[in-house]
């Protein structure tokens, strides 16, 4: 058995699978230093160790041994898509995988997914794994048959890979529609809840609706969490009639430990649970949902203080005008950014020259910065802004008709 999750606790005792061999950097007594490995990273190191052992036994030599570096595109994709902490070791794995992809050395399925997503593999970045390829692979498991994604990554047939990537792209579009409907419903519920509490969100959120789709509860939980900065669980009814919940957390609130405490206080509520600090899942009977909701809020009220509940945006300060160019963007994009290793966010004073809505929910801005009018976009923000303000932003390049234009992607404004 290979795994990377924290072992299960039953009555304060760690319970491990009944297996001859268990490889998990997070099990007790494991001295492997890199505890943040994703499942694909664990398996990669198992293969490295196995290759070394077989080489010692004379099964093959240094020259005839399998080339495991050919797997690094898959290791990089899985590491980012699983949203594990990008510590030094994980960044190393992702960087090597990206290097191979940019050089055209990738599995047929990875190349097909880049094509289906309209992304350029020669400029591959960790962003592509998390927001382009990963969602398409995961969509199959959420709404259809997860083996589609697996086959796409494993096939050596470029034609078959392209066919599967198109199917995954179609399923992902369906996933977005399902998610959009659930999200609107959840946000309406949230607005109603906050209206009853003087526009103040409770310390934690738990929402269930009979119409929710089990496959996208985690995505909706993440969206709600981002909106109100609260630990959030979203539940849907599974095929077995039980409620399946997926949770997302905020820094300072260990979600799996919270479930463990809840289970101790209310042993009748949770049938199963597991996960990490920032993401977890659980299963319960529908009759226990109200108890779960109250108990989850109680744990949150005990563990969270005002500072933790306040959203904090860390910045890298102002950006020198001389660095506001495509070369800077490409240099940053070439690095490995992600969970717990965020890309730079800059903060500068700007004068708003014009502003308008695009797509009904995004604010398009022209701002004067460094004596030059620049483009800026604030995704998901539809309210007008003041004439002068401080923008927290990331840099991106918008390519059109072969020309590159640098724009600010707004994170916040004050």
PLM-predicted stretches and their roles:
Residues 18, 52-288, 318, 357-361:
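Hydrophobic helix-and-loop "lid/oligomerization" segment in the mid-to-C-terminal part
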Residues 259, 368-384:
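Beta-strand/loop nucleic-acid-binding surfaces
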Residues 313-374:
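Accessory interdomain/linker segments of ATP-dependent helicases and helicase-like nucleic-acid enzymes
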């Amino acid at each position: 058995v290979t795994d990377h999750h924290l072992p299960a606790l039953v009555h304060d005792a760690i319970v491990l699978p009944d297996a001859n061999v268990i490889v998990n950097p997070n099990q007790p007594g494991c001295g492997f230093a890199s505890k943040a490995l994703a499942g694909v990273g664990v398996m990669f190191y198992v293969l490295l160790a196995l290759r070394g052992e077989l080489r010692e036994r004379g099964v093959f030599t240094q020259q005839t041994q399998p080339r495991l570096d050919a797997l690094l595109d898959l290791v990089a994709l899985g590491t980012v898509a699983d949203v594990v902490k990008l510590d030094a070791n994980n960044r190393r794995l992702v960087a090597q995988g990206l290097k191979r992809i940019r050089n055209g050395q990738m599995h047929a399925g990875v190349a097909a997914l880049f094509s289906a997503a309209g992304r350029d593999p020669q400029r591959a970045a960790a962003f592509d794994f998390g927001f382009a390829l990963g969602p398409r692979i995961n969509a199959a498991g959420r709404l259809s048959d997860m083996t589609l994604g697996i086959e796409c990554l494993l096939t050596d047939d470029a034609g078959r890979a392209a066919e599967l990537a198109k199917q995954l792209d179609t399923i992902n579009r369906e996933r977005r529609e399902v998610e959009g409907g659930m999200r609107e419903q959840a946000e309406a519920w949230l607005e109603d809840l906050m209206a009853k509490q003087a526009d103040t969100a409770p310390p934690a959120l738990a929402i269930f609706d009979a119409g929710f789709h089990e496959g996208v509860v985690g995505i909706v939980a993440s969206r709600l969490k981002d909106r109100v900065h609260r630990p959030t669980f979203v539940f849907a009814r599974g095929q077995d009639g039980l409620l399946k919940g997926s949770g997302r957390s905020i820094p300072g609130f260990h979600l799996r430990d919270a479930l463990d405490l809840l289970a101790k206080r209310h042993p009748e509520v949770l049938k199963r649970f597991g996960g990490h600090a920032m993401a977890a899942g659980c299963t319960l009977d529908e009759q226990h949902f109200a108890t779960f909701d109250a108990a989850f809020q109680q744990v949150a009220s005990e563990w969270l203080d005002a500072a933790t509940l306040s959203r904090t945006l860390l910045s890298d300060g102002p950006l020198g005008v001389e660095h506001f160019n495509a070369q800077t963007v490409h240099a940053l994009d070439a690095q490995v950014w992600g969970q717990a290793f965020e890309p730079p966010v800059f903060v500068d004073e700007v004068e708003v020259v014009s502003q308008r809505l695009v797509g009904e929910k995004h604010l398009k801005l022209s701002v004067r910065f460094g004596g030059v009018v620049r483009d800026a976009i604030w995704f998901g923000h539809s309210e007008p802004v003041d004439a002068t303000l401080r923008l927290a932003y990331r840099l991106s390049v918008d390519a059109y008709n072969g020309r590159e234009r640098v724009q600010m992607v707004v994170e916040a404004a004050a």
